[in-house]
Amino acid sequence: MPENVRNIVVEELVRTPVEMQKVELVERKGIGHPDSIADGIAEAVSRALSREYIKRYGIILHHNTDQVEVVGGKAYPRFGGGEVIKPIYILLSGRAVEIVDREMFPVHEVAIKAAREYLKNAVRHLDLDHHVIIDSRIGQGSVDLVGVFNKAKENPIPLANDTSFGVGYAPLSETERIVLETEKLLNSEEFKKEWPAVGEDIKVMGLRKGDEIDITIAAAIVDSEVQNLDDYFAVKEAIYEAAKDVAEAHTERKVNIYVNTADDPEKGIYYITVTGTSAEAGDDGSVGRGNRVNGLITPNRHMSMEAAAGKNPVSHVGKIYNLLSMLIANDIAEQVEGVEEVYVRILSQIGKPIDQPLVASVQVIPKKGYSIDTIQKPAYEIANAWLDDITKIQKMILEDKLNVF
């Protein structure tokens, strides 16, 4: 092992790999789910503010926009097209520098524009002028640019603004991959072109018991795109077949697929919506209540409860360390021979450089026939290399190369 300049600890983890456990649960909330809408808007606002700060001042000023609330509206969907009678209310809050050298920076204008642009792309049937109200109450802050630049020179590596930890793991299990790829396919541009009636509010739940997997899909169907029950059932069948194709591409286990199981034909209950999201009908959403940074909710795995979306990409370890842990775990799983599973946990200490965590814990389950002794050094080197280049994550975020939900 190399001299441990950083506090990186690589050890063997003694536990049953997830793929061999009897029961596995996996969930993904699609991009149109109210919680995902909150995450998406929070992150879009943070990235827009970051880019505008750089454009005007050459540096990202302090902000955290991870407090977004989606308050459900009220709608009357019906086959052929219904109506939204009470709009969805979206509250943008958090904090951002608004006064720079005694001049106003347009925080609210940038934030609302970013939120509208995100919604336009994320929820196709949402009428931004009639179906939603966006209210920015982002708190104010002021800054002296000279002081900011001097601090940046003194600390080229940002200092952690919190004592917090991030968690990542790799590789994904078969069930995790199926859940993730199912939602991505159903919300892909290609699938929407063929089946425009499928809304963006798609929740996929996976349950594996032994060698049998149940995939339950709740997909909001857009009422204006289905004229009757025949159309509705045709859309459900298309969802079923698409999910079946995904499952068959990732496993040889038996897979059962269920679509919109709350439908009750005798009572005339079907999952139709005006906009493609349940937020129109009273379902609320909050940042951090949904997917982790790898896009999944995985109770069989180590997880952090930090909300990554909307946190600033410079010094907020609640965002940076979760992404970093995932990237380190992915590289170890892909590049180091003999790794069955790897879990990475990184803990910061407030006020310390983010490339010097209090600990970076790498736990590895070796494959049968392999020893942790041959895995420790390359795993350490991968973790150390990422910490050396930690500011790269900020660039990757602003280039939209990393998702946070």
UniProtKB/Swiss-Prot annotation:
Cofactor: Mg(2+)
InterPro entries in the record: AdoMet_synthase_2_family, AdoMet_synthase_3, S-AdoMet_synthetase_arc
Protein EC: 2.5.1.6
Organism: Thermococcus onnurineus (strain NA1)
Protein's pathway: Amino-acid biosynthesis; S-adenosyl-L-methionine biosynthesis; S-adenosyl-L-methionine from L-methionine: step 1/1
Gene field: mat
UniProt-recorded name of the protein: S-adenosylmethionine synthase
GO terms, biological process: one-carbon metabolic process; S-adenosylmethionine biosynthetic process
Catalytic activity: L-methionine + ATP + H2O = S-adenosyl-L-methionine + phosphate + diphosphate
Keywords of the record: ATP-binding, Magnesium, Nucleotide-binding, One-carbon metabolism, Transferase
Top class in the EC scheme: transferase
Coiled-coil segments: none
Lineage: Archaea, Methanobacteriati, Methanobacteriota, Thermococci, Thermococcales
Family: Belongs to the AdoMet synthase 2 family.
Alphabetized Gene3D superfamilies for the sequence: 3.30.300.10, S-adenosylmethionine synthetase, C-terminal domain
PANTHER family: S-ADENOSYLMETHIONINE SYNTHASE
Entry-linked NCBIfam families: PRK04439.1-3 (NF003364), PRK04439.1-5 (NF003366)
Binding site for ATP: G139, Q140, G141, S142, V143, D144
MF terms in GO: ATP binding; magnesium ion binding; methionine adenosyltransferase activity
Biological role: Catalyzes the formation of S-adenosylmethionine from methionine and ATP.
